[in-house]
């Protein structure tokens, strides 16, 4: 963005090397580009690394995602799958103006504290998973922050209970491992509960 300004003074060759390294590093860290570099379609076949799935043999192909980098990962998968995608649900921390999805519903969940929209998204995911059968394929993209964004308390615990519990843990200085240990016991999604 301001490359020209940065290269207009000082050690120009040194600055160019540092900028080139920085740009390459950022490209490798970009979740959208990373997904696009490992996944593609060959006709009706989805290829991810060395794995292959013939989507013409699938009844439905679903995309589920959550996390702070989910926007970019889900957008890449949505784009790669195109018309093969039946439906997608992504829970993100912030919906960006550049987010473009064809068949994916995007929900803005709460992070670090759960919220109502994240709960609605989780209920949609559970309905989708419950309606699936062995002929359906789920592509799941998860990144950091997903345990907070996927707020879906088990029966007998309210969303407000989960918010209060998380808030107390955060204020007490609990780390992510301690917080996730508690979330696993009060969530219908976290800790493998969805699977």
Name every feature range the model reports, one short phrase each.
Residues 1-195:
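N-terminal loops that bind phosphate or other acidic moieties
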């Amino acid at each position: 963005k301001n490359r020209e300004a940065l290269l207009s003074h000082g050690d120009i060759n040194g600055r160019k090397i540092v900028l080139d390294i920085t740009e390459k590093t950022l490209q490798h860290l970009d979740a959208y580009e990373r997904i696009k570099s490992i996944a593609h379609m060959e006709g009706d076949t989805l290829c991810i690394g060395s794995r292959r799935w013939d989507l013409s043999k699938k009844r439905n192909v679903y995309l589920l995602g959550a996390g702070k980098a989910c926007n970019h990962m889900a957008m890449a998968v949505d784009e790669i799958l195109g018309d093969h995608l039946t439906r997608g649900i992504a829970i993100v921390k912030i919906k960006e103006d550049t987010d473009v999805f064809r068949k994916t519903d995007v929900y803005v969940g709460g992070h670090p504290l759960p919220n109502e929209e994240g709960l609605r998204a989780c209920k949609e995911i559970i309905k989708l998973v419950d309606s699936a059968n062995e002929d359906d394929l789920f592509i799941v993209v998860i990144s950091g922050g997903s345990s907070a964004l996927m707020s879906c308390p088990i029966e007998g615990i309210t969303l407000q209970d989960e918010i209060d519990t998380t808030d107390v843990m955060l204020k007490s200085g609990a780390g992510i491992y301690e917080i996730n240990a508690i979330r696993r016991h009060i969530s219908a999604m976290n800790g493998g509960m969805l699977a």
